[in-house]
Amino acid sequence: MTANARIPARKLPLYRSLYVQVLFAVVVGVLLGHFYPEIGEKMKPLGDGFIKLIKMIIAPIIFCTVVVGIAGMEDMKKVGRTGGLALLYFEIVSSVALVIGLIVVNVLQPGAGMNVDASAIDTKSIAAYTAPGKMGTTTDFLMNIIPTTVVDAFAKGEILQVLLIAVMFGFALHRFGGRGTLVFDFIEKTSHVLFTIVGYIMKVAPIGAFGAMSFTIGKYGVGSLLSLGKLMGSFYLTCLLFVFVVLGLIARFHGFSIWKFVKYIKEELLIVLGTSSSESVLPRMMEKMENLGARKTTVGLVIPTGYSFNLDGTSIYLTMAAVFIAQATNTPLDITHQITLLLVLLLTSKGAAGITGSGFIVLAATLSAVGHVPVAGLALILGIDRFMSEARALTNLVGNGVATIVVAKWTGDLDTEQLKQRLDNPDWVAAQEPEAILDHKTERMDVSGSR
């Protein structure tokens, strides 16, 4: 069997499709939260439990994927080149997202005419987000990449810290050459076991999506959407514009269709829609990107790093929310103020993780740093932040997926034939049963023998 051999598709009954299961769960969650809000709020542990299950497996998966990818490479200089190109891409595209958010909010002006008195706003609800020290400086962010201990990084699940350890371990293992084969094989087999566990966890994804959506609608209600509908509509429109125009053009220039790519990750998008966290599908996205033809090393470096440096949806949200607050409170923002805001956001936006609520914390820190826009205005959008979090997470997910393919192509680590095959046939078996891919990989590994 060749490396590019196509896995025979197994047509599953519709009710066994993860996409259908999650879609059904989200709809039921919305209905329960709307008609029985008290019961809906009590469903929160279901969503929290699912995200905790995923988080417990993220650190070891990143470690194994990156170590195997780096240790198995012949040209070690390529690792540095891949990381450098990824950071360059992240900076350019996230900056474009910030600018697009700024342009759209100035054109549509969703906060104009609200005439809110900033001094009369009750700030008790946002006190937890605006407390001193909630978000550190750039130096703090960089220093936090270095863990206190190796165990501490894994215990806390700090993605960038685990990534640093994995890169160092991979380089060290590579230097051992043939003497490190036993360790290499153990880590590779372990990664297969971990992805099988992910397959088990994803079977309860519909329950997690149901619980999270029931809680969101039950706690915040549909009414909160209507009161600030113009901002919500503007934000969702901007995210769609960014995904299908900006990312669509990037995808087209690199030989694939954004529409086909979105269809390919439809299960992940629905899970993120339900949980409002792009982290909930991180392991599954790594597996799916690898099976699109991207090399393991590239996937292991780009996806985890992107969760801190390539949050396109969060970037759009930050500029739009900041200017919206200024418009709603009649705070004048001239071109100088807006450029200053943009420059500050270029730094603070890199401190947002791919978890629910992080964007709001970054926004609070940014408004405090800029000083011109009243921080009290955050209370205006607190009620709908959870709903906007869903669009942020969805955009972040698509953005990181596209980034992986683009960087893989730049570094020559992309099998374009496999990419085309997978996108043209998105209903392949791995979309429903990740463990089948692992069986396929094991079979290939047994045929090829050693690394």
UniProtKB/Swiss-Prot annotation:
Q: Which PROSITE patterns match?
A: NA_DICARBOXYL_SYMP_1, NA_DICARBOXYL_SYMP_2
Q: What biological-process GO terms show up in the record?
A: L-aspartate transmembrane transport
Instruction: Check the record and name the InterPro entries matching this protein.
Output: C4_dicarb_transport, Na-dicarboxylate_symporter, Na-dicarboxylate_symporter_CS, Na:dicarbo_symporter_sf
| Transmembrane segments annotated in the record for this chain | 17-37, 53-73, 85-105, 153-173, 193-213, 231-251, 306-326, 339-359, 361-381
Q: Does the keyword Transmembrane helix apply?
A: yes
Q: Has keyword Nucleus?
A: no
Q: How does it sit in the membrane?
A: Multi-pass membrane protein
GO terms, molecular function: fumarate transmembrane transporter activity; malate:proton symporter activity; succinate transmembrane transporter activity
Compartment(s) of residence: Cell inner membrane
Stored Pfam families = SDF
Q: Name one GO cellular component term.
A: plasma membrane
Chain's role: Responsible for the transport of dicarboxylates such as succinate, fumarate, and malate from the periplasm across the membrane.
Q: Which family does it belong to?
A: Belongs to the dicarboxylate/amino acid:cation symporter (DAACS) (TC 2.A.23) family.
Question: Per its UniProt record, what PANTHER family does this chain match?
Answer: AEROBIC C4-DICARBOXYLATE TRANSPORT PROTEIN (PTHR42865:SF1), PROTON/GLUTAMATE-ASPARTATE SYMPORTER (PTHR42865)
| Protein name as catalogued | C4-dicarboxylate transport protein
Query: What is the species of this protein?
Result: Paracidovorax citrulli (strain AAC00-1) (Acidovorax citrulli)
Q: What is the lineage of its organism?
A: Bacteria, Pseudomonadati, Pseudomonadota, Betaproteobacteria, Burkholderiales
